[in-house]
């Protein structure tokens, strides 16, 4: 690892023992992955994955205190992943007891630490920090120190920023010292595609399902996707960004994708085209049959496989404003067709606080509320990590939530059928 004079001085402790430990940790981290240098973090804001005050994370709180007490707070303001708790989300007395007394008993204390370290503002808790309403949107080429997998893959792919799939705490350390190790997706070579994925479906593929298929196939490699542009309208508009948000989250969770290129759509694919494809790239063809095969491969891990769903979560990652509006229209229309006025399964739509605030300013907010759908900014995954929640039959159209929890995956159309008409069994 070649360090600059300033970096070496930090490493040697000339700016204090605490900052030296941070630099030493990042250098060791980089050396494990063959990094040749430390490069400056250039984005305006950081984003942290650790937003939950789990009782078991005592070493994290101790480390945070060391940083705060030594004056080594973040050089950037930052957003953080969603909060784990919400009184508006349906839960039993026992679930609440476990949440507050055993799992997230340190939530208030931890949020105080995040405030001292430099969180953007009190409601900057979302996994979709890059939304315009939130304001943490990196520019093309900027170097980041993020770790939330769905945000990293979005920033790399849709925005053209540069960030590795870091871990929690490592993300904060990059902001504290102002540098990250250069390897992997921070390099030109590391951003070359080693897979060509050909989309040969007869209709627009479900974002979460296509992302799952590609993620499980290429794992941590970089795919160059051909044929998806015709289903996305040929440009990177808000609808395409929303699609790629959900698609990317599935590639990152069902596999370990940190970057993908979509021909004629994503910025680097538009700029460099097929020059992004490495020699001897493998080929993966996705057609209707392949998507159906992947869909049917998902295990159902409910204790009672034919149980009636008790809860539906939508918004992992958090929903966009347009998604909230579109789903309001779909739910209202489907309920009308079914002769109902309210959803027949408790349903939660999650989104960033800033997005929800904007949504509340539209006439759609009252329409959705009248259907019985709850909107909030909780992290569905953190809710499902409660052992008592895990036993509940929960449905979702998020392949990330399906992968990490006991929630059962359905397509968007099937979710709509379930929550408005009680159908779509399979």
Label every model-predicted segment.
Residues 1-313, 317-426:
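Non-transmembrane, aqueous-exposed alpha-helical and coiled segments at domain scale
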